[in-house]
């Protein structure tokens, strides 16, 4: 199994964690992400400027994003923003 990225996000902060086989390899905290308060472009900018630079050397295979405001109508906003910065095959937003 390869590395996965898990994000637990509220409106004020996001906890990011790279894991492999149940072991935490790297973790950090960033700004909050909420599609209720931010556009896809704003979320993309946040990920590109503050998340991607910390993850660019990790071979991430999947992203699992758990966030406030990720109602069914808004999950595509977050999924698209993640994909623009971290183009992995599996991106799940809850």
Pin down the residues of each PLM region.
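Short beta-strand-loop/turn "lid" adjacent to the catalytic site in phosphate-handling enzymes
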Residues: 52-93
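Short glycine-rich, Thr/Ser-proximal phosphate-binding strand/loop in the N-terminal lobe
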Residues: 3-45, 58-59
């Amino acid at each position: 199994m390869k590395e996965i990225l898990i994000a637990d996000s509220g409106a004020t902060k996001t906890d990011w964690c790279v894991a492999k086989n149940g072991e935490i390899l790297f973790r950090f905290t960033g700004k909050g992400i909420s599609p209720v308060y931010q556009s896809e472009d704003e979320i993309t900018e946040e990920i590109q400027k503050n998340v991607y630079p910390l993850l660019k050397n990790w071979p991430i295979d999947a992203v699992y994003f758990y966030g406030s405001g990720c109602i069914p109508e808004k999950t595509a906003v977050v999924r698209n923003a993640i994909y623009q910065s971290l183009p992995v095959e599996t991106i799940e937003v809850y």
